[in-house]
Amino acid sequence: MTVVEKLNKLRALMKERKMDVYMIPTSDFHETEYVGEHFKARSFMSGFTGSAGTLIVCKDCAALWTDGRYFIQAADQLKDSTIDLMKQGEEGVPSIPEYINEHIQMNGVFGFDGRVMNTKQVKDIMDQLKDKHITICAQEDLVGMIWEERPALPTEKGFFLEEKYSGKSTKDKLADIRDVMKEHKATHHIVTSLDDIAWIMNMRGWDISCFPVMLCYLVITEKESHIFINKDKLDERMHANFKDNMVIVHAYDDIYEFVKTIPADAAVLLHTSVVNYAITQNLNKEIRIIDCPNPSQLMKARKNEIELENNRKAHIKDAVATLDSTRHP
C-alpha cells in the first residue's frame, strides 16, 4: 500500500465515525521517547521514519510536524505522499492546535487513540479548541484497522535485577514511595513510565531497542501493588519478588478495566504529562487527582553507593572500548 492509499483508507474510517481530524503522534502507551516496532503508527501511515513527528489527517489534507533534525529527511520521504511538511520552529508554521482549529468544523469530532496521547497533551489541545465545542473520539486505534502486518508486541522474557546492582530492594523503594503518597494524602499511585517501573520493581527487559525496560503498568496502593504485564515474560525471580512485596500480577491490557474499580472517594497520584488519556478517562470523575511527577523520578536520580560504584566500573569498560576502537594499529 502506498501512503496515499493508506490515507484514503483512514479517511474512509474517519468518515464512518464523522471525524473531522485524526491525530497520530510518535508514542506508545507509556509516553516513551523511542518506541518499539509495534507503535510506529506515524511512520507506517506517512512513510517518514524519523524518531520524532506528529501526523494530522483531515478530510481533504494532511500535515506532519517534525523538528530541525529531520527537515531534509522528511522532505524527501514525504514526496508524492500528499502530506504537507510542517517545520517546527520555523516562522509562519502553525502549531498543531492551530492547524486542527483551522480544519475542524464547529461541533466537530477530533479523533485519536487515547492510549498513545498523554492526558495533559489532550487537555492543552482542547483548551485551544474550546470555542469550537469539539467532541473527542478516542476509543479506537484506526491505524490498527489498516495495518495488516503490524509487528506484534514483544514477548521476550525480562529479568530480575539483583540488589548487588540496584543497591536497594523493591520493598524499600515501595516503602519510600508510600511515604510520599502519605504526604500527598494519596490512596493510589498510577505509574505508567517504563523507566520508573523498572527502577521500582528492580526488573529489566528487552521490549525497546537500547532501552532495557518491559511494557507494563503499575498501581501502588497503601498496602499492595498491582502490575499489568504479559505474564509469559516473567521469570521465577521476578515472580518471587512480586510475591514477597504483595504485588499482584494482571494481564497487560487489564489496566483500563482495573482503574474503573478505584473507588470514587480515592485520591490518585499520577503525572498527567505521562499517563495516557484512556487511563484517566476510565477513572471515576469524583476521584481527587493529585497531578505531580512520579516520586520515583527524583528517587532514582539520587544514586546510592552501589550504583555509583557500578557506574564507575561501567565507565572503565566504556573507556577501554573507546580506546580500542580509536587507537592506531
Give each language-model segment a name.
Residues 1-329:
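Terminal domain-start leader segments
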